[in-house]
Amino acid sequence: MQNNFSLPPKQQNLPNQRWLIYPEQPEITKGLAKTLEISPLIAQTLINRDISTIEQAQAFLDPESIKLPLPIQEFPDLDISLNLLQATISQQQKIAICGDYDADGMTSTALLLRALKHLGAKVDYAIPSRMQEGYGINQRIVEEFHQEGVSLILTVDNGIAAYEPIARARELGVNVIITDHHDIPPQLPPAHAILNPKLISETSPYRGVAGVGVAYILAVSLAQRLGKHQGLIKPLLELFTLGTIADLAPLTGVNRRLVKRGLQYLPHSQLAGVQALIQVSGVKAREEGRGKKEEGRGKREEGTYQEGRGKKEEGREKREEGTQTPINFQHPIDGGVLNTKSKDNQKSLKPDDIGFRLGPRINAVGRIADPQIVIELLTTDDMGIALERAMQCEEINQQRQLLCEEIEQEAIAWCESSQINLQEERVLVVVQPGWHHGVIGIVASRLVERYGVPVFIGTYEEEGEEIIRGSARGIPEFHVFEALQFCDELLGKYGGHRAAGGFSFSAENLDKFRSCLSEFAHQCLEIQHLKPLISIDAEAEIKELNFDLYRQIDLLHPCGIENKDPVFWSRNVKISEQRIVGKGHIKLTLIEGEIIQAIAWRWGDYFPLPSVVDIAYKMRENTWNGQSNIELELLGVRLPMEVSRNSQTSPQNFPQKVEFYYNNRPYTCSLYQMGDVKELRIRNSRGEVLAIQQGQKIGLLGKTRNNAKQVNVTDARFFNLVKAAMSALKL
């Protein structure tokens, strides 16, 4: 029987991808471009981010101008938390922090250690063992804290699902404040106070903060209340920026505003550990709007930005602010006015510097070594100790890279030699002995990128081979946590969210687990979903890809989750030269009227590429021997296609936008051609969009596709709204 295993055919030498090109909206694009004096390509990109009015665009481009609500107005338990901490500090009782071993958890722990010591607290910390105990506070830690005379336990980046350990702490008479950002369980733990953005309004600008964001809000609010914030906020903001980007938190709302500022502070960091980490990793600050990058700076083997989520929509450069008037607005959460005319503040790090350089060096320690190394790095004021710890991070990250490469190659070899049929299974389950638990999540992301299907990768626990422990990474149409819930009866411990998860189960259930996941995958995945998705903002001609456009892209920065770097495409591009460089990358010279260089990371398997192709890419600046040039980072390539304005990736002659009222509320609706099907989009006054494709009962509801939730449009509240929209469109 023929094997339909959906690996890229060897003879084709092309990545196995599907392209989603956002539909053009020429009238809105023209208006934004003219008013804001920006390129139509940038205007179209803003529209693709659900920013379609002048007011929305101005607020997005200048986040410092937005008046933020005070955190105490948004977080119901913040006042209780501040009272508990204030009383504990004033009585000189012990505070203990329980952190986590990822970059978010370690930066959160370091941030609160610094802040509480600055405020006069007696404070210590503990982080559970990744290999022996797994994620989150546990009863052992609670018992040890109690024996040490701890009066108040403060969790960071964990605790929201730890009902039993928190209940035990209460039995022992220990006060507990939970600070976390993970999903809310059916039953909240019995803590004295819980700070979690998932418990506040979905429209709050604080909704997207990571664990380090919650820790930052708590620390700054406490310092403000005690009148001891002088000299504290700036270093805390640096740690907030490191943790937020490394954790892949959405760079929207308060995250966008604070990260934008933190990236300017980092090159001149007051923290010895940050200085040492920047020095060891070779990161250099750039002038705003120029973003110099040495040859090969973003290489994937330097670090793993996505650290296991299988996404390539992470943040890049930063907005040019050097000519702005200083803002006269002050807010306690960010420390007041930023003088953008200061020479120091005209240089900035970029999210890539953290995502590909600093973050992986921190994360590697939590994955395969002792998190105490990072905590000491980020809390010491001794430059000698900081350099020692930074060098340890460097060495550990190199070990992590080697482990990832070895495991990835072994996993690929298993996939190539197996008889698995991915079009039938629709999910890839790979389990092998001897793999390191700490890095298999990264490998899962790479396998998703390679094969385009959800990946569940595991290895056996050290003691015997009775228990399998693993990590999972999904694709947009597949909800990882729901898949694990579907297999609940087969699993021991598990957790996660839409894009990623972790699990353990008895080895004897491996075949049943694989079958169960395949059954779930068939409920949500079609054959066309089994290719990596490349979302593309607009078509550009090579001659448009100049430094002026590159500097305008800075207006969108910092980019990252929910504000991805712009991706453009060009058709019928000739490849005049191509060669393998580094560890399996392709270096290309392209011609389409103009000549431009390009790099395709980890595409060695597709070498050589056809001589004429359509390409999808991001722009980057490459500096070599003092010369700067625009270079393209290829994300997608396909054989040339004749795509007309009325083709599968562009809107047909449907009305651009129609306004209508339903239940006395205003809405707008529009119809687009997406591939072979039509998609109806309905937007309410809050900016939420309901998107329904022809013939489907399940639609997407949210402010962006990345954070949208699935809804059943046959429910009455949606069904009648859809009927009203179709009537308005005269369908």
Language model region names:
Residues N13-P15, Y22-S151, Q224-G289, G303, ...:
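Hydrophobic helix-and-loop "lid/oligomerization" segment in the mid-to-C-terminal part
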Residues S281-E320, P326-I333:
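Short, basic, low-complexity termini and linkers enriched in Ser/Thr/Gly/Pro
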Residues P8, K117, K122, R256-S281, ...:
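Acidic, two-metal ion nucleic-acid-processing modules in DNA metabolism proteins
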Residues P190-K228, I233, L237-I245:
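Short alpha-helices
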Residues A162-Y163, D247:
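Intrinsically disordered, low-complexity regulatory tails of plant transcription factors
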